[in-house]
């Protein structure tokens, strides 16, 4: 609301949230904005039908999008992304004696039986295609076995956000976790029921 006031308090704003979870942050933000006389159109970028149902309950009238690119382009954005980028898929690269390769899941030599079972049936393998051009600057000469992660989707989404802000005006508040510098190692983990 403060930024909206400083920008001239235009009534034509879009509140856009990327990955709004259950809609709680949006509901709270909209309640605060209303105290300043701001009632923007609400647009959520969310792919999960289950979460869309919860968000529609929390913020009736919200419009849903699969992608940032489909958001309206006719007015300034108030864009919020809370832990959105953390949820995007990563691509793992592993340094081999032959250079950088994508780290993939493959079958052990024993493979699977007819029922799809097998002891230690899956393992990480290095892909066949060179991936040296996907390695961030300054990381090419790491020792074999080094793993790094990249997120091509993050760059694409951020590029679209930047383009929209430059053309439409507005502001983005992005809250995410990360490191100032690239780190090596795998962050992949399996999570079920928040464990």
Each model region followed by its residue ranges:
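SAM cofactor-binding core of SAM-dependent methyltransferases
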Residues: 1-74
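Class I S-adenosyl-L-methionine
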Residues: 72-195
